[in-house]
């Protein structure tokens, strides 16, 4: 019965995930306006009053705090990206400066009301939520700013394990989109391959099952598995990895070797071979074996020089005309080797023969 309920929770949770993405542009544009306006207030305060003490400012700012002169200075930077230190909170809104300026022009009187009479209030809440009704407070959604799931039960939104669709906007369904490992309308159940570690009125804590478990489990160790995935076998100690490479039928193609992995295995080519388009292991002419102590072209030159020295020694010793001819041939060969032999001109077969 409990498994049936869990399955239903998963299905319901999956349905709740399929929600239209909310851009919430009007609300975010309003908050962009507020942010640039607030930066303007800070900038003018720094320019004219560097005291930093609220009581001092109330006493000494005089009429400038709500003067038309200051408002004009503030409005010069409103709706400009350059007014903010970064735009991270407003990414993805096309033509945000134009849209912000449109809001500013449309609601100029409301913004002036805030400046002259409402500066003691939070501007974002007063303007965007209460007056223009473009946003909702955090934890609320929709046209009437209804509470997101969880708040009515004095818990966090979606019991702290998900996000509320439309949170903070005048849009959305209010359904919870659960974090990985959680499911259900309120994200109060553990998803498949997760188990319930603890539960309180504030929510549930779920942890992932052991990697060898198939489906539900009771703890994070392999002993908590009720069934095992392919590549694992159920033992007294729980799910244990199966070494498929012990099976002679694994990796039977020519030049293949079996490599055991956790829960599976893979077939790789022996050293000096590589897979072709048909996944067969073929001789790799480009394979790089252990490099010799001396480059191959230098080896050939050393052989040529050594041969020359040996021949000259015999020529001097015997004084034979034939050896004089061989000496001449060797000198010509040595010159050709020195001029034309390099790693690019040496055939692949010769490289492999010399271990290069």
Swiss-Prot record:
Major enzyme class: isomerase
Expression tissues: Isoforms a: Widely expressed in tissues including body wall muscles, neurons, pharynx, hypodermis, seam cells, intestine and gonad. Isoform b: Widely expressed in tissues including body wall muscles, neurons, pharynx, hypodermis, seam cells, intestine and gonad.
Signal peptide region: 1-17
Catalytic activity as recorded in UniProt: Catalyzes the rearrangement of -S-S- bonds in proteins
Superkingdom per UniProt: Eukaryota
Keywords: Calcium, Disulfide bond, EGF-like domain, Endoplasmic reticulum, Glycoprotein, Isomerase, Membrane, Redox-active center, Repeat, Signal, Transmembrane, Transmembrane helix
Motif (CXXC): 27-30
Knockout or disruption consequences: Viable, with no defects in coordination. Decreased number of synaptic nicotinic acetylcholine receptors (nAChRs) at neuromuscular junctions. Isoform a: Deletion leads to reduced sensitivity to the nAChR agonist levamisole. Isoform b: Deletion leads to sensitivity to levamisole as in wild-type.
Molecular function GO labels: calcium ion binding; protein disulfide isomerase activity
Cytoplasmic side: 318-321
CC terms in the record's Gene Ontology section: endoplasmic reticulum lumen; endoplasmic reticulum membrane
Disulfide bridge map: 27-30, 158-176, 178-187, 245-258, 251-267, 269-281
Parts of the chain that traverse the membrane: 300-317, 322-341
Residues in the Lumenal compartment per record: 18-299, 342-356
Complex and partners: Interacts with unc-29.
Similarity field: Belongs to the CRELD family.
Function: Protein disulfide isomerase which associates with the unc-29 subunit of levamisole-sensitive nicotinic acetylcholine receptors (L-nAChR) to promote L-nAChR assembly in the endoplasmic reticulum at neuromuscular junctions.
Protein name: Protein disulfide isomerase crld-1
This protein's encoding gene: crld-1
